[in-house]
């Protein structure tokens, strides 16, 4: 179920502060964040965020196409190694 439009997008408060500090300083450093649930806003375009996936911070460069999506969508948490091969079929 989608979020109600009257509530507006969810963004953690500390994330807005970090983005504002980064814009003021002018440095293009990776902003480490743990809030995968936050929505990407237009003021984040051009910034690089390190989104935590449970193990490390995955760098995400925000573009205009990403606006309205969640940060967690760009930092996968599970590693897929493929299905295990059938050992009986390998012997033949």
From Swiss-Prot:
Family matches, as Gene3D superfamilies: 30s Ribosomal Protein S19, Chain A
Gene Ontology MF terms: rRNA binding; structural constituent of ribosome
GO cellular component assignments: cytoplasm; small ribosomal subunit
Keywords: Ribonucleoprotein, Ribosomal protein, RNA-binding, rRNA-binding
SUPFAM superfamilies tied to this protein: Ribosomal protein S19 (SSF54570)
InterPro entries: Ribosomal_uS19 (IPR002222), Ribosomal_uS19_bac-type (IPR005732), Ribosomal_uS19_CS (IPR020934), Ribosomal_uS19_SF (IPR023575)
Family of this protein: Belongs to the universal ribosomal protein uS19 family.
Role played: Protein S19 forms a complex with S13 that binds strongly to the 16S ribosomal RNA.
NCBIfam families: rpsS_bact (TIGR01050)
PANTHER family: RIBOSOMAL PROTEIN S19P FAMILY MEMBER, SMALL RIBOSOMAL SUBUNIT PROTEIN US19M
Name of the molecule in the record: Small ribosomal subunit protein uS19
